Structure formats: structure tokens, C-alpha cells
Amino acid sequence: MLQPKRTKFRKMHKGRNTGLAHRGSTVAFGQFGLKSVGRGRMTARQIEAARRTITRKVKRGGKIWIRVFPDKPITNKPLEVRMGKGKGPVEYWVCEIKPGKMLYEIEGVSEELAREAFTLAAAKLPFKTTIVKRTIM
């Protein structure tokens, strides 16, 4: 599963997920991309589940790029523990997703196969997505 090797601080504030994604919003590496339309959090497990789905669908053909990385730690206090006494231990890692963020890219496969793979992967994600094609300039 994806997670940072080391961080400056162990725990993070919750924060608010507002605005649109301006960086990482275009197809930069492949021919087709899976782009977020909604906002939310994508856990390391969800990133891996969607990646495995895409890989299984395209089999040996094509190259896949993962354009997101879970760099935010989410903490959780154990069950039946009273409030207070500090923040709980880190349970898992997430990536904050804003509308317009490119999640996955693929090349070397037909458009039909790319659409099928991305549709299956999108079912594993907690927000709406769309499939985009690279625009030649």
C-alpha cells in the first residue's frame, strides 16, 4: 500500500477540502485519463484496488500512471476510550481529491478497452469521475 517513507510531522489537522484542482488536472503522460468530478478522500486501499482493476482489465498491454499519492495521515482512537488524552494513532493514509484532479492515466491500449478499465475502476472510488482523452495541441 502507498504511504510516505517519512514525514516532518506524524499527525495532521482535519482541514477542509475546498476549491478546484488546478495542478494535475490534464492528461500529461498517457492517452486517456480518469478524472475526478466530485470531491472526497481517496484512501491508499482504494488507490490500490482501482489500480489492480485497471491492470487486470488491460492484462499485459498498456502502461498505467497513478497521479495521486496518499500523503495525509488519518488518526482514530480505539473503541470504548473516553474523550481527551490526546489524538489517536495513525490508522491509514488518504489523498484529498478536488474536482478536476487526474487520478489515473493509461496509454498503449484502445479507447474502448481504456473506457472499460476506467469504468470498472471508477466503481471502486467514493466520488464521481469522468474519462478524458488527451488533446493534441
From Swiss-Prot:
A GO term for molecular function: structural constituent of ribosome
PROSITE patterns: RIBOSOMAL_L16_1 (PS00586), RIBOSOMAL_L16_2 (PS00701)
InterPro entries: Ribosomal_uL16 (IPR047873), Ribosomal_uL16_bact-type (IPR000114), Ribosomal_uL16_CS (IPR020798), Ribosomal_uL16_dom (IPR016180), Ribosomal_uL16_sf (IPR036920)
Listed GO CC annotations: cytosolic large ribosomal subunit
Keyword Disulfide bond on entry: no
Keywords: Ribonucleoprotein, Ribosomal protein, RNA-binding, rRNA-binding, tRNA-binding
BP GO annotations: translation
Main function: Binds 23S rRNA and is also seen to make contacts with the A and possibly P site tRNAs.
Family: Belongs to the universal ribosomal protein uL16 family.
Quaternary state and interactors: Part of the 50S ribosomal subunit.
This protein's name: Large ribosomal subunit protein uL16
Organism encoding this protein: Psychrobacter sp. (strain PRwf-1)
Encoding gene, per UniProt annotation: rplP
